[in-house]
Amino acid sequence: MAEAKVLSGAGLRGQVAGQTALSTVGQSGAGLTYRGYDVRELAADAQFEEVAYLLLYGELPTQAQLDAYLDKLGKLRDLPQALKEVLERIPADAHPMDVMRTGCSFLGNIEPENDFSEQHDKTDRLLAAFPAIMCYWYRFSHEGKRIDCVSDERTIGGHFLHLLHDKKPSELHVKVMNVSLILYAEHEFNASTFAARVCASTLSDLFSCVTAAIGTLRGPLHGGANEAAMEMIARFSSPEDAIKGTLGMLERKDKIMGFGHAIYKENDPRNEVIKAWSKKLADEVGDTVLFPVSEAIDKTMWEQKKLFPNADFYHASTYHFMGIPTKLFTPIFVCSRLTGWAAHVFEQRANNRIIRPSAEYTGVEQRKFVPIEQR
């Protein structure tokens, strides 16, 4: 047997763990692409549902295909009564990612993927249902209201905002949600996506793969950076206060979320897009604190550490300006990244071999067993 090659690098940094045709991350001249399209162009000109179709079905849809896809998703939004009853049993202080994980897993019990030929339909079902899973639990546990899980909003972003706020969202807010969902849709072999592919490599069902991904995204080193960023930004009352506070955090070597990236070395292309929309929302509401504070932290981090904001940092203020509770920031990520997760599951299934790496042993040398009476 040939000796296995030992790969160094904490967290498998820099290691190629497989092939994908779905996205490129950090390549020179095109920081992030989905099936060859620059994410900045998609965010400027496409609907999220077009991007979902691109990732899941391989090409951008025609107008007729997009209309049919929107119709399909619209009919799949309502939740089974049994799932609503499960969501009503989850307490208000539960972690919202636990809610998403449970909702996904339970839906897989009552609407299972019986054959891989159903993978697209089951993904579309989850894509349509996730906003309602999040909002039904949140509105019931926090307000005691059993909401209607169906709305007349055409888009997933608009539908989510309608369910959350119980009113028709503004065109600006729908547009911003659309952009946000596009920016978070896919990102190559990140931790949650790789978890989904490992699960898929065992030929497990789609719901198990997505549940594994949600559980992985739940960890604070992967998901939750925008929530942590919001909590930090909210501490400061002015740009001057933010600069002083950030310098203090750096001196104490505190973890400052929302900056730097494992792959991007110069900038995160998603940041420039969402920052511009955060500024538009700040202007809309007449904000004179949150966005200036964010910019002050941004500037200080670059001056002191040459660290740039990633996609999560300005998403914090963006979501806040739209009235989205901080605890729901990461579940929104789930509603978007589902498209990337599922596309990777499809890709893994199409050319599968079970993912089973080796480990470099660092324990004691082989030794003789000692009977218990002699120990």
Predicted regions and their residues:
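Non-transmembrane, aqueous-exposed alpha-helical and coiled segments at domain scale
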Residues: M1-R375
